[in-house]
């Protein structure tokens, strides 16, 4: 009976990892397909909605990533994480931010900020702040993982750099526009963080 319960507790974890992996395919395709059309240095990932099939593919990535993150949260809770604690709230905000940013797309470069563009921007700020902090709290209060902690700190620093890089967009001529580069580094670190958390949960379940 104990063995059956253990399997049921961890059944959601492989699904979350599969969701993380599958969410990568559309965004990688968009990067390859838009070479010469969008700059990975100056254009954000959200700008892929303006290329052929970009809106749908980007939505698949964002919503798959949100669903996988919720699945990972379920795995964390089944491993003993408090259901109503700050980590659950922060991961929920991350997933919600991804969803809201998908429903409210960004504005074209140089266009005035619309209601949708403003909501998209604030949703991005919430999600990019939430996940690094959630990872740091997991490593400090739930699963002692140096890897999770390092990716959390690196993602937090890069998230701050991404926010600061918007200055060159808001005030043209104040510096090089590199927010696309920082955002891509940030997403790479956030993916690594999510995979690191999944690995830490698996190790915890195996050892229990």
Residue ranges and their predicted role:
Residues 3-204:
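Hydrophobic, aromatic-enriched alpha-helical segments typical of multi-pass transmembrane helices
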Residues 206-208:
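Short, highly charged, low-complexity non-transmembrane loops/tails of multi-pass membrane proteins
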